Amino acid sequence: MSWVLHIAFQIQVEHPVSELISGVDLIREQILVAAGEALSVAQEDILFRGHAIECRINAEDPIRGFLPCPGTITHLHLPGGNGVRIDTAIYEGYQIPPNYDSMLVKVITYDRDRKTAIRKMIRALDEMEIEGVRTNLEFQYDILHQKDFQEGNFTTDFISTHYEL
């Protein structure tokens, strides 16, 4: 019998959520360790505070089975403000090829509790404008308005039980 062990040395995609609730810059810590330095914070000193939510805005069409939507971004307005973090590399004129990772923008909001973080995310998505390609922006916005989502009553079956796609 053979065994294969896979070790991935990358940070999780959701690391901004962990960073916001812990106050620890995980990328900085990863670089320090890679450079042979010690971590700047001890595990027992990390305290979790508040609530963070991440929405991934993708160039895809939820109504058509989340098919990819390549094209050119013709207009872009990203939200901002206290407790709103935007991770992206897109810009007006950005070309999305057909063979790509569909994630365009990660929007992360942080506040004292889930309800307030959701409200902040709703405002952020309401302010966001991406034109030229189809995205899942409106779909994410709709999910945030679902009572079950707001109350934390969801599983990995949420989309299939709340939407006919």
Regions found by a protein language model. Give the residues of each.
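ATP-dependent carboxylate activation and anion-phosphoryl transfer catalytic cores
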Residues: 1-165
